[in-house]
């Protein structure tokens, strides 16, 4: 009682898949504040490091953009070495007084690595080369795992179909899908 509650921001499903040396990362476009849709076509992914890395974010947009800028600086500082840049960002994110207050997660793919970077200092490399973050991530992840295991679909097709499935289930995910490929 007496405490102001901040509106819960839920706005994203981001999914990345690597298959046969090709990587794809996509997201829906919905941004919500509480139970209201604010925007249908928010762009939550971008290409980094001379087009060799794609990243997407879930969480507060301003926080995520700040983290993306920092991640890009780390990639430049470490010559595009994805894991090293991710670990250094996670370390800074966790220990810096300003950064540790940022509320976002990053999903990152290159042609041979898929990582999730969190503000708690985690850098997670899933065993199946699928990364998923955001409100509908578990629906998209389940769909992607099944499609990867049981179909010959490309990475891009798996991302597209899985995000469509998540959009059919998760009220915080829509079907305005943007996908980038490597």
UniProtKB/Swiss-Prot annotation:
Key words, A-Z = Allosteric enzyme, Cytoplasm, Hydrolase, Metal-binding, Protease, Sodium, Threonine protease
What's the chief localization of this chain? cytoplasm
In this entry, which stretches build a coiled coil? none
- Give the catalytic activity: ATP-dependent cleavage of peptide bonds with broad specificity
Activity regulation description = Allosterically activated by HslU binding.
Q: Where does Na(+) bind?
A: 167, 170, 173
SUPFAM superfamilies per UniProt: N-terminal nucleophile aminohydrolases (Ntn hydrolases)
The active site is formed by: 12
Where, per UniProt, does this protein localize? Cytoplasm
Q: Name one GO biological process term.
A: proteolysis involved in protein catabolic process
> What does UniProt give as GO cellular component?
HslUV protease complex; proteasome core complex
Q: What GO molecular function terms would the record report?
A: metal ion binding; threonine-type endopeptidase activity
Q: What is its EC number?
A: 3.4.25.2
Classification via Pfam families: Proteasome
Q: What task does this protein carry out? A: Protease subunit of a proteasome-like degradation complex believed to be a general protein degrading machinery.
Q: How does it assemble?
A: A double ring-shaped homohexamer of HslV is capped on each side by a ring-shaped HslU homohexamer. The assembly of the HslU/HslV complex is dependent on binding of ATP.
Family per record:
Belongs to the peptidase T1B family. HslV subfamily.
PANTHER family recorded: ATP-DEPENDENT PROTEASE SUBUNIT HSLV (PTHR32194:SF0), METALLOPROTEASE TLDD (PTHR32194)
The molecule here is called ATP-dependent protease subunit HslV
What is the organism of origin for this protein? Chlorobium limicola (strain DSM 245 / NBRC 103803 / 6330)
């Amino acid at each position: 009682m007496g405490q102001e509650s901040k509106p819960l921001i839920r706005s994203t499903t981001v999914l990345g898949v690597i298959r046969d040396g090709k990587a794809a990362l996509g997201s829906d476009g919905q941004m919500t504040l509480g139970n209201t849709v604010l925007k249908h076509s928010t762009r939550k992914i971008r290409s980094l490091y001379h087009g060799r890395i794609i990243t997407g974010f879930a969480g507060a947009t301003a926080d995520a953009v700040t983290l993306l800028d920092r991640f890009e600086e780390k990639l430049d500082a470490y010559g595009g070495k994805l894991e090293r840049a991710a670990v250094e960002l996670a370390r800074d994110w966790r220990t810096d007084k300003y950064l540790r207050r940022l509320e976002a997660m990053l999903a990152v793919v290159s042609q041979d690595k898929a990582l999730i970077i969190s503000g708690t200092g985690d850098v997670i490399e899933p065993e199946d080369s699928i990364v998923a973050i955001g409100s509908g991530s578990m629906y998209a992840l389940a769909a992607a795992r099944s499609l990867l295991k049981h179909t010959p679909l490309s990475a891009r097709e798996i991302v597209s179909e899985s995000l469509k499935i998540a959009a059919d289930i998760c009220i915080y995910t829509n079907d305005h899908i943007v996908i980038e490929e490597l």
